[in-house]
């Protein structure tokens, strides 16, 4: 929950004090406490409170002014500012590198912690759930006047008002389209083309409660619904559309809560995403990609489907499930927020193509230089900017939340957004807060800061922008600010053919990303296809990739070859009017670049394949042949490429399988090549079940391949698949037997419901709910009058690590520490070394004071009086609960009388374990070495 984090990001600065309580509380982290990755750069304060308050998001306009969305009114504090939240404008009028002027553009009661701001010339787009609002500053005075200016809601229907898992900011892509995303609170909206999108998930944003401003439905109620584009989209999602709100196209889905996206000049989309367990990520988003947070129908959480032995990162992003995209850089706990891509900036050549991602949970802005890696990207992370280089994090949910809050100034840097300014400098917005998480606002000062990162001695200069002339509009395409380029795109498009000479000059630039910006506009000018054909022969991979994307969008607009069949045969000599996949001169499916071939595969998703009524196939054969050739070029390793092949035939996997098997498969499934085994797993149609059963039962195959065969069967919903799994469960081979039984229990009431599995499991002796023996497991309540441990006194004791190692063996029954222990409670490896000593001690003395997210216990009371305490692994029928020591029990639902939250920790307190002060000091000393 990012804004939950951001507003408890807004933990009150009032608790942050200097040694002398009479001194005023600090209002920002001084630049001297920051560490930059490049010693040639410097950081300075560009603006600070009271010029702005609680910044959630920011943007820059063509004049170099910075516009900020404020989040003062949030959840419990939604009436803090009765007039509503503000969009604030800040300006450096004298060019000294510091803002000296600020004013309110708009303030209204409807604005309650808006999550996005985008400025495109005189249009100001504000993301305020349930609406996407466009304010048009008609008189261009940067002050909204209802009598003169315009306010329009162009999209509405996003759930989660005053909740950060909802609508986020708009950014303009290199194609002039508006890109935006929303978290997994759900959405039902109709675009200006009349298409309705219904996007639900397994997430309940209000935990069964109602909330003011809700739309009258819960995302669980619409999970699995088909949208008018013919696809099922779930969870958090990203989209693009025309500036008027028409032509919405979903770019990816099944996120948890991606805060923002950034789009390169080539059209590559990067995003970050989070969850409270340690599996936050930064990733490349392929068109149509499924991130995997929920099940494919959006009805089950990843926790329910987590397989035995899977790590959190693997299970959360379903990296062992067919149909999910590569998860990218999964870096652990955190709460990622704003993201930006700097193709060029004032930072210089060595920082070209710099991807920046804010991580307030770690007091850091991450940096990456994405490198093509097959059909995807390699993302090597580093701390571009941090106040916590030692990684001793506090105040974040992933390391204990409120119990870990300290007053150390360097821990209060909480970046909420990052961007490249119109002057080329990097700007970072900061909440300045000791806490991240908790759906709470605690900041009494409502503080906020904007920092500037630039070369030492940098003198800001904002290039003058003149969109009124073709030459001026084309020149503005070189701007370092993404939405200034967006305004330039619209202006160039409006100038039409008059801009062609200036665009042709831009096409000759030595930098590929500059050339790419011109290519996107070619499709709006005369002779577009002929010019694009020439560019498809360019030696630069990114230019060919961009050109193919432009061609796809061109045909999507004109309707030929993608969304409907093209009537006629245009493959004759000299004509290039047919659909792109039939152009003989555009051999995209044999392109040497895996990224170009990936894009070609993604484009096939929308091609009509079926034969029409009069027997003509309208390029069906061309599309099918392209798919075969693309599959033949899969190297058997590249997961990004593999997923693109699956997306190419989404909804027609069986047809794709039959097309490929003659040339890539083998009649004997034990002789399959790695390439075909992976493709078959990704497509897993009904006709593959028998072959995968053979592979699952073959001890000659590696264990990983046998388990993959089981997964391929499981993700097939047919009766044949369920019966095959029953046969595997009856096998004597323990490896597949145990996993097959797990799959049967997991699927019997969802994907395989209706196949009679309950009776089959009973008659075959695999699972009979009437014969299940259950054991009571009760965690005793701590004593009402606790032993008076004094944390300050405990912290003074010298601990003995050797004695602590012996005492810690008791921890291994519930916790993982290094290579020892059970994965029941939170993994303690490295945890204590990152925490202040008093935090470590308190977690042992008072474990219920702050329970780690994801480890809240439940109490099951059975009809026979048996009580079981533990963590719910599956809340279906049967209920699966894991108790102390990792004991896992399968509980038939009809035997449960009551199920309720435990309300306290599943861990015994130090007093209950009979630990004295010295033993506490010893075990804390030991844990801090691990």
What residue spans do the PLM features occupy?
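Sec-exported extracytoplasmic/periplasmic mature domains
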Residues: 137, 609, 632, 650, ...
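Beta-strand-rich binding/interaction modules
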Residues: 366-368, 485, 875-881
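C-type cytochrome heme c attachment motif
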Residues: 425, 449, 521, 805-819, ...
